[in-house]
Regions:
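Structural signature of eukaryotic scaffold interfaces centered on beta-propeller domains
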Residues: 24-37, 94-98, 102-103, 107
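Beta-propeller blade signature
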Residues: 56-76, 115-126
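Blade-level signature of beta-propeller repeat domains, shared across WD40, Kelch, NHL, RCC1
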Residues: 98-126
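Beta-rich catalytic cores
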Residues: 28, 64, 89-90
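Short secondary-structure capping micro-motifs at structural edges
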Residues: 14-21, 26-33, 52-58
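Recurrent small/Gly-Pro-centered beta-turn motifs in extracellular repeat architectures
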Residues: 44-47, 105-107
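Surface-exposed loop and turn segments in beta-propeller and other repeat-based domains
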Residues: 1-24, 81-89
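Residue-level recognition of short loop/turn positions
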Residues: 37-38, 74
């Protein structure tokens, strides 16, 4: 397992700079999605990063690692995979298929991003 399946609680909700720091340094979990042909659930999540004062919050955010986690019908973890770094859009640029996941390839830090067309990877689960 690459990351903990929980995120730390933010210590100060009244200070926006602490909230931003918390958002970058902690794991972020996305919605759980269902793949009906496999009777499995899939969830993407971002790993946290250390704050580097030489980089913008945007650059730090786009450099986070994206993970794919699979769950069985009782939500037991059956797999976790580290996806290609600096490749995918972290703002809901994906959708489930009946037997996999489609993820758009448009990370701002990628030199291969084609903004004139759509590029994506399909991760099929067997």
């Amino acid at each position: 397992q690459y990351t903990a399946n929980v995120a730390d609680e933010c210590s100060d909700w009244n200070d926006y700079s602490k909230w931003e720091r918390h958002g970058i340094t902690n794991t972020h979990f996305y919605d759980v999605m269902y793949m009906p042909d496999l009777n499995l659930y899939v969830r993407l999540h971002l790993g946290g990063v250390d704050i580097d004062t030489n980089k913008s919050l945007s650059e730090l955010g786009d450099s986070r690692v994206l993970y794919l986690m699979l769950f069985d019908h009782e939500f037991n973890i059956v797999g976790e995979y580290k996806l290609k770094e600096k490749t995918y859009n972290y703002f809901t640029g994906w959708c489930t298929l009946s037997n996999g996941l489609l993820i758009f390839k448009d990370n701002a830090l990628s030199e291969l991003t084609d903004y004139d067309g759509s590029q994506f990877d399909i991760y099929r689960v067997h």
